[in-house]
């Protein structure tokens, strides 16, 4: 809330409205903004100046805050207009026509209770000012007949004040009107008549702030009266608002029962404050500041009997060099902050809270026997004796803040402790002269001693004499070396940037928060607590000893504690002092070499960056997560038992011995464990095992694993040269095996695979250079692996005949990869169709012979022949029956010259870097992406190729030397479906 409308609610204005027929002259908001001074002042229009037209504001009803109010409003809404009328709607012109048909007598009938007309769109209420500017004279007609009760041509000062207030508010906050200032509307409106009772309207208005109340006052007379109710105007906030004395007096006379006034930052703040204190007899809270406050103001406060709270800030009191007297019998809270004054004398028998923070008085005389809170922080001119005198004069004092008062001494604190037996909170931060010697504060609960140079280990003896202490802050106490406290009620302690601090010993059953950081000399920590749940001690580089007896501790973070030894593992085992531990972080603890945990509650363990760890043994039946990134020297690992569901040991290249007992594990990755020779894997639910590059893994280990993990579905044995026929024969114990990767192995015979893996769907044999040409004959001659869908023979040495037979017979394959096959020659299905028919006839007598290609559709979807140097021609006619082929990749086939494809479902074709390509014929109506990077095709060839691709969206022609970038428009003309054409700068050769 910023500024308030008050005089616009007078009866005289209502009479003026009736006399003028409720007419509103159309004004421009821009005119009002031109008359403003831009500094947050109220805008005052001259007598001959036209007042700005204020847009009609939307009424927002908060249904969630007042269901009863919304239900009542909904009843009026539905009873006024049938539902079908709301659904069908009316045009803006219809609304204007209806408005023009209304007579002036109807508009003024029962002016006090006249209806507020709300124009509603589909989802929100709108004003009728939304009629388009194209309507011409109809706009003024609507304004004349459906006026919301704003005064007409002869505007009163109070109406203009209300408008000026809203304009100032919007300008100050940098917001624009929500209204439609140009009198136009981009949607059709509906006119809805709503009769709201005074009680219901009062309830709705209770949810509005003062700015919205001012806007609502301009709707109609009933709303004006309702929004002026004094219940809504008990708090008058003019903070940083330039309000004149006349306006403020009018406000005070209009609302004499206001209880709270804020004129902080207003001009003539002293006069405004005097007026508020002398006029508003029910004033309880007064806030002033930013200016000169005279002594007479403080004298006038005594006459304001209901006053309870006064705040004065950023002000000069009196002439700055005189004594200010303040006397009040009922004042309970006083704040005089950042003020310039020589001396203060305060007599307030009921005062409970006093703040003089950052004021520069040299003396403060207090007569406040019931004062409980005294804040004199940063009062640098207050001497030690003045502070002592002020504090001991308040025997009921419970909270004292003397931070940044450099003159405070131990003697002053001792006398305060004797005089104020109920002192609970003491903030003596940045007081270099105190050491708390002989200071007894038995009732103290909060003690803050930030940056106190006199606090040493000897001070802990006197702190220990405060048995009720709950919060202790010792940050930046540079002379503090040891802290040893036995305080049963201590709940929180903070030790930050204590450079010489070496030893911490805390015995407190209620301790729940410990903050220790940037203490480079800290070596030993001993903690006993039943309430501590989380302990974070990051970057304590010299910490060597940790003793914990914390039965509720659940999370521990010891990251970058480089000096911690293996003995720390005993603390977090079942026989240690943390039986409820769930999460342990030991990242970058580089002194750990052998980690052994036996903990029945531990669920998460992180050893990231522990490069010296060579042995890991976990007996944690509930552990579900472990992170070993950076443990690249780990040699032996035992997980017996654990609740892990997945484990990645591929980042442990030196792992040689592995023992896992994990009843819930489903995924295990050993990729890169090149020296792993002994592995016992007891994971009955394991479905995925990746043992890539485990060069020492042998047949006996594989056989034992398949026997103990019968549910394996995916097995990766890439680069496992020690695996032979015996190990592959053991795969018959895996009935669910569907994915097998034997790439980069020395296999010569695939017979064990064909016999043991009947359900296999994916077989990868990349770079198996020892396979003979007859190794795959069972696939296309005997019908082996009938469920096989994906086959990868990349970088193999199979001859052209074996490849041709495989392509001709294995029509059930969906994915085939022949990347880098040097024996791969032309893919010409056009010239071999008759040959293939004869070929199938040879094996027709066999029961396992597959259906001939002439009668069976090929299921191939993805064919990859990347980098096959001997392919020169690719021909796939309709007779080849590649009805499912969607992706064909022939990139890097440098000798490929001719491509002729007729594939009805081909979506992606990659011919990038086929630098010899000359002929491209495409009959692919569904082709969406064509890649021709670095090809020597000319523009005519590309145009001819894409002319039959009606669905082509992406065409890549980058680095094509015979194609100019300026010719891209031709391709779009030939193929209108193109959305993306990639080309390089013009490289067209002459």
Swiss-Prot record:
GO biological process, any: plant organ formation
LRR repeat segments: 237-258, 280-303, 317-341, 348-373, 397-423, 441-465, 466-477, 478-503, 519-542, 550-574, 589-612, 614-633, 640-652, 653-678, 734-756, 758-782, 785-809, 813-839, 882-893, 894-914, 915-937, 949-973
Family matches, as Pfam families: F-box-like (PF12937), LRR_At5g56370 (PF24758)
PROSITE patterns: FBOX
InterPro entries: F-box-like_dom_sf (IPR036047), F-box_dom (IPR001810), FBL15-like (IPR055312), Leu-rich_rpt_Cys-con_subtyp (IPR006553), LRR_dom_sf (IPR032675), LRR_FXL15/At3g58940/PEG3-like (IPR055411)
Keyword Cell inner membrane annotated: no
Domain of life from the UniProt record: Eukaryota
Residues in F-box domain copies: 190-236
Keyword entries, A-Z: Leucine-rich repeat, Repeat
Gene3D superfamilies: Ribonuclease Inhibitor
The protein's name in its UniProt record: F-box/LRR-repeat protein 15
Organism listed in the record: Arabidopsis thaliana (Mouse-ear cress)
């Amino acid at each position: 809330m910023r500024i308030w409308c008050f005089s616009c609610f007078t009866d005289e204005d209502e009479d003026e409205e009736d006399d003028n027929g409720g007419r509103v002259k159309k004004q421009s908001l821009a005119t009002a903004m031109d008359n403003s001074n831009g500094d947050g002042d109220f805008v005052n229009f001259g007598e001959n100046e036209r007042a700005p037209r204020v847009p009609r504001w939307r009424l927002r009803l908060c249904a969630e805050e007042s269901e009863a109010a919304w239900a009542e409003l909904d009843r009026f809404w539905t009873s006024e207009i049938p539902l079908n009328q709301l659904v069908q709607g009316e045009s803006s012109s219809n609304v204007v026509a209806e408005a023009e048909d209304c007579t002036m007598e109807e508009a003024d009938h029962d002016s006090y209770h006249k209806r507020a007309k709300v124009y509603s769109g589909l989802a929100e209420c709108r004003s009728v000012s939304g009629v388009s500017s194209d309507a011409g004279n109809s706009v003024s007609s609507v304004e004349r007949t459906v006026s919301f009760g704003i005064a007409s041509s002869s505007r009163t000062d109070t109406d203009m004040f209300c408008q000026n207030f809203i304009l100032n508010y919007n300008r100050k906050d940098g917001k624009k009107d929500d209204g439609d200032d140009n009198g136009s509307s981009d949607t059709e409106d509906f006119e809805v008549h709503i009769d709201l009772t005074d009680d219901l309207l009062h309830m709705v208005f209770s949810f509005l702030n003062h700015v919205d109340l001012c806007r609502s006052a301009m709707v109609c007379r009933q709303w004006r009266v309702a929004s002026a109710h004094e219940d809504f105007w008990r708090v008058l906030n003019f903070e940083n608002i330039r309000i004149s004395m006349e306006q403020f007096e009018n406000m005070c006379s209009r609302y004499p029962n206001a209880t709270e006034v804020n004129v902080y930052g207003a001009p003539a703040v002293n006069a405004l404050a005097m007026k508020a204190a002398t006029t508003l007899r029910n004033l309880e809270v007064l806030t002033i500041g930013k200016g000169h406050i005279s002594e007479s103001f403080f004298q006038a406060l005594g006459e304001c009997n209901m006053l309870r709270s006064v705040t004065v800030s950023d002000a000069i009191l009196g002439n700055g060099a005189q004594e200010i007297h303040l006397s009040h019998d009922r004042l309970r809270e006083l704040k005089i902050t950042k003020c310039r004054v020589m001396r203060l004398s305060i007599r307030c028998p009921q005062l409970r809270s006093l703040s003089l923070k950052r004021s520069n008085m040299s003396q403060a005389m207090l007569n406040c026997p019931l004062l409980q809170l005294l804040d004199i922080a940063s009062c640098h001119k207050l001497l030690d004796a003045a502070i002592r005198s002020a504090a001991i004069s308040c025997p009921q004092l419970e909270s004292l803040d003397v931070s940044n008062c450099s003159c405070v001494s131990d003697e002053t604190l001792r006398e305060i402790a004797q005089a104020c037996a109920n002192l609970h909170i003491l903030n003596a931060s940045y007081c270099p002269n105190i050491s708390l010697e002989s200071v007894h504060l038995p009732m103290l609960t909060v003690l803050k001693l930030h940056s106190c140079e006199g606090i040493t280990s000897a001070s802990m003896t006197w702190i220990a004499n405060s048995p009720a202490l709950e919060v202790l802050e010792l940050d930046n106490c540079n002379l503090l070396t040891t802290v040893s406290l036995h305080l049963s009620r201590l709940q929180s302690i903070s030790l930050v940037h204590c450079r010489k601090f070496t030893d911490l010993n805390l015995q407190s059953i209620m301790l729940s928060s410990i903050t220790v950081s940037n203490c480079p000399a800290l070596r030993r920590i001993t903690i006993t607590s039943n309430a501590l749940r989380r302990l974070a001690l990051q970057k304590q580089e010299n910490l060597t000893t940790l003793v914990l007896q914390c039965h509720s501790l659940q999370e521990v973070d010891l990251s970058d504690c480089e000096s911690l030894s293996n003995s720390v593992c005993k603390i977090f085992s079942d026989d240690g002092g943390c039986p409820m531990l769930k999460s342990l972080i030991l990242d970058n603890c580089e002194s750990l070499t052998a980690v052994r945990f036996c903990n029945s509650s531990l669920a998460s363990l992180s050893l990231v960056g522990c490069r010296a760890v060579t042995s890991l043994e976990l007996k944690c039946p509930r552990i579900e997560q472990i992170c070993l990134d950076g443990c690249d020297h780990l040699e032996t690992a035992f997980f017996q038992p654990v609740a892990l569901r997945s484990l990645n040991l591929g980042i442990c290249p030196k792992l040689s011995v592995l023992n896992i007992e994990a009843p819930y594990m489903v995924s295990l990755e050993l990729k890169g464990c090149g020296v792993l020779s002994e592995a016992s894997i007891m994971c009955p639910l394991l479905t995925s095992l990746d043992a890539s590059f485990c060069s020492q893994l042998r047949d006996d280990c594989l056989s034992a694993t398949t026997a103990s993990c019968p549910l394996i579905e995916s097995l990766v044995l890439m680069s496992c040269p020690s695996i032979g026929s015996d190990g592959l024969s053991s795969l018959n114990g895996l009935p669910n095996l569907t994915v097998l990767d034997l790439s980069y192995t020395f296999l010569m015979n695939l017979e064990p695979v064909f016999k043991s893996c009947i359900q296999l769907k994916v077989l990868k044999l990349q770079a198996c250079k020892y396979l003979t040409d007859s190794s795959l004959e069972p696939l296309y001659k005997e019908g082996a692996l009938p469920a096989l869908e994906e086959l990868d023979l990349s970088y193999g040495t199979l001859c052209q005949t074996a490849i041709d037979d495989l392509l001709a017979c294995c029509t059930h394959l969906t994915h085939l990869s022949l990347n880098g096959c040097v024996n791969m020659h032309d893919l010409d299905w056009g010239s071999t169709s008759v040959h293939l028919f004869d070929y199938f006839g040879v094996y027709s007598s066999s029961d396992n012979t597959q259906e001939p290609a002439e009668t069976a559709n090929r299921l191939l979807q993805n064919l990859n022949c990347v980098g096959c140097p001997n392919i020169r021609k690719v021909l796939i006619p309709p007779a080849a029956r590649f009805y499912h082929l969607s992706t064909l990749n022939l990139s890097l086939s440098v000798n490929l010259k001719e491509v002729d494809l007729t594939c009805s479902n081909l979506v992606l074709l990659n011919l990038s870097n086929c630098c010899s390509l000359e002929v491209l014929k495409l009959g692919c109506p569904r082709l969406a992406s064509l890649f021709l990077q670095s090809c020597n095709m000319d523009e005519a060839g590309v145009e001819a190729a894409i002319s039959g691709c009606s669905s082509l969206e992406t065409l890549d022609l980058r680095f094509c030397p015979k194609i100019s970038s300026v010719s891209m428009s031709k391709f779009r003309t030939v193929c209108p479906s193109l959305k993306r054409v990639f080309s390089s700068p013009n490289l067209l050769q002459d």
